[in-house]
């Protein structure tokens, strides 16, 4: 990174074209490859066909040479089937450039983030990026609120609007022209910006699409900037490697001056709403202690804002008003709800006794058992009713590999759903995986499940349970065996940054 420092000086004007030259550096392509898949010199230098061809240094050199040509941009803009740069079946060059563009465009944002964080804030920033960092906040705040807005982010987005959005963080004109070129190419190939980022995981240019999506969502969230001035309890979380969240807060001073000067009526309308706000992937949740009428006004204000600012026709049915989470909401793989726990207190005053009935709101995070069973059925671990079946695709693996893969899935699920209020659904999912593993092994050895499990004994369950117990023991000291036995509260982890597919078997 030392050779790029000349381009990354903070005191340089944002109008200077200091980002585009990085695209012409061969080292930046190796850096992107290192971030995505782990640096492997043998792959970069390989000339074989297949997977490693995409990351060959020879391909990179040819790409850079073509970009130095004077008629390169003209040929690219006048796209035709004869153009060797953008060919529908051979879009290797455009894929490489899009990945590098995403990394380079994140540089100004990441530099602002690092310059704004100091001391402990920088150490705690990584923990705040964790998915599980949302739930302690929800437990402390949401149980005291009255209404919740469940919002689906509007989509799709026109390429010109995306370019205008990214202009707020990238001032390099050359990069913006290149971005416009790439966007029109992806639109011609049928790639559109969906409302859910999970759809991007199946695309080859995942980093580029994530960057576009987060830039767009960050601009959509500009409506919440002046609301944060009215309520200091606003919280928000980012998704993926994009660091737009802090950049969103850095725009506060400018927006507050504008809204205070020109939007006094709006500020009075939203006076002290006591708002809590979180976002993940394609969904927003906005909670307030205000009345139902106030939340309805919020709903139509959002619709008008997105329609006027982004030219998006957002239907009101995409925004749901939930009264204090009486109806569960699906969010980040959990089902969120607030349950009223009744309690009775007996009061004795002289000869008179009174019974006082109190209701205490308790925030619950439940495991979506039926959704998980549907995912397992789709991956052929069980049927639609939840009855375990064998996994034929893994029957050719060794016994240790089969047990290791099933065990890893159980540990990942236990890790992610460690903070759930009720573990019954999680135990059912683990039972399905454990019995599916036994059926797969029995199918491989042409034996019955009972005979095979009897032969393995307790060693078969070690992969599923013991390693999970070791993780818990790191949190609760081994010396405090009584506290570990009595503790029944949720355990949240701050090392979970994305949700992997259930069938993932990568280390």
Curated annotation (Swiss-Prot):
InterPro entries xrefs: Domain_X (IPR024937), Maturase_MatK (IPR002866), Maturase_MatK_N (IPR024942)
UniProt GO MF annotations: RNA binding
GO cellular component: chloroplast
Alphabetic keyword roster: Chloroplast, mRNA processing, Plastid, RNA-binding, tRNA processing
Subcellular location: Plastid, Chloroplast
Keyword Chloroplast among record annotations: yes
Main location: plastid
Superkingdom of this protein's organism: Eukaryota
Any one of the GO BP annotations: RNA splicing
Keyword Chloroplast: yes
Pfam families xrefs: Intron_maturas2, MatK_N
Primary role: Usually encoded in the trnK tRNA gene intron. Probably assists in splicing its own and other chloroplast group II introns.
Recorded family membership: Belongs to the intron maturase 2 family. MatK subfamily.
Name of the protein in question: Maturase K
Native source organism of the sequence: Fagopyrum esculentum
Lineage start: Eukaryota, Viridiplantae, Streptophyta, Embryophyta, Tracheophyta
């Amino acid at each position: 990174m030392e050779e790029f420092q000349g381009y990354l000086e903070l005191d340089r004007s944002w109008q200077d074209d200091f980002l585009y030259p990085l695209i012409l550096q061969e080292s930046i392509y190796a850096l992107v490859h290192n971030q995505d898949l782990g640096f492997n010199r043998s792959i970069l230098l390989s000339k074989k066909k297949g997977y490693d061809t995409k990351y060959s240094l020879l391909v990179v050199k040819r790409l850079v040479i073509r970009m130095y040509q004077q008629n390169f941009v003209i040929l690219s803009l006048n796209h035709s089937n004869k153009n060797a740069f953008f060919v529908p079946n051979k879009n290797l060059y455009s894929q490489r450039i899009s990945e590098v563009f995403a990394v380079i465009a994140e540089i100004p944002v990441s530099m602002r983030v690092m310059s704004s964080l100091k001391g402990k804030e920088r150490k705690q920033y990584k923990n705040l990026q964790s998915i599980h960092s949302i739930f302690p906040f929800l437990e402390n705040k949401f149980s005291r609120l009255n209404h919740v807005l469940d919002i689906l982010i509007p989509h799709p987005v026109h390429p010109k609007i995306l370019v205008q959005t990214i202009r707020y963080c990238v001032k390099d004109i050359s990069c913006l022209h290149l971005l416009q070129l790439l966007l029109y190419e992806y639109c011609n190939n049928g790639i559109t910006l969906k409302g859910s980022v999970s759809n991007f995981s199946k695309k080859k240019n995942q980093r580029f699409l994530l960057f576009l999506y987060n830039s767009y969502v960050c601009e959509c969230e500009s409506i919440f900037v002046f609301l944060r001035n009215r309520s200091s309890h606003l919280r928000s979380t980012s998704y993926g490697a994009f660091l737009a969240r802090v950049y969103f807060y850095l725009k506060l001073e400018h927006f507050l001056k504008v809204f205070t000067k020109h939007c006094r009526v709006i500020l009075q309308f939203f006076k002290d709403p006591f708002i809590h706000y979180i976002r993940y992937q394609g969904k927003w949740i906005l909670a307030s202690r205000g009345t139902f009428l106030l939340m309805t006004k919020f709903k139509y204000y959002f619709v008008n804002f997105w329609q006027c600012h982004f030219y998006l026709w957002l239907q009101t049915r995409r925004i749901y008003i939930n009264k204090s989470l009486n109806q569960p909401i699906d969010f980040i793989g959990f089902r969120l709800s607030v349950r009223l726990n009744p309690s009775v207190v007996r009061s004795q005053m002289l000869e008179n006794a009174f019974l006082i009935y109190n209701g205490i709101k308790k925030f619950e995070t439940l495991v979506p058992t039926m959704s998980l069973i549907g995912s397992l059925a789709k991956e052929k671990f069980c049927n639609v009713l939840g009855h375990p079946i064998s996994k034929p695709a893994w029957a050719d693996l060794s016994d240790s590999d089969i047990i290791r893969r099933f065990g890893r899935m159980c540990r990942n699920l236990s890790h992610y759903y460690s903070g759930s209020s009720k573990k019954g659904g999680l135990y059912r999912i683990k039972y399905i995986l454990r019995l599916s593993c036994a059926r797969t092994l029995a199918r491989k050895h042409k034996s019955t499940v009972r005979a095979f499990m009897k032969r393995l004994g307790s060693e078969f369950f070690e992969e599923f349970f013991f390693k999970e117990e070791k993780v818990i023991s790191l949190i609760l000291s081994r010396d405090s065996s009584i506290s570990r036995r009595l503790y029944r509260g949720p355990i949240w982890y701050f090392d979970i940054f994305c949700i992997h597919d259930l069938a993932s078997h990568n280390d």
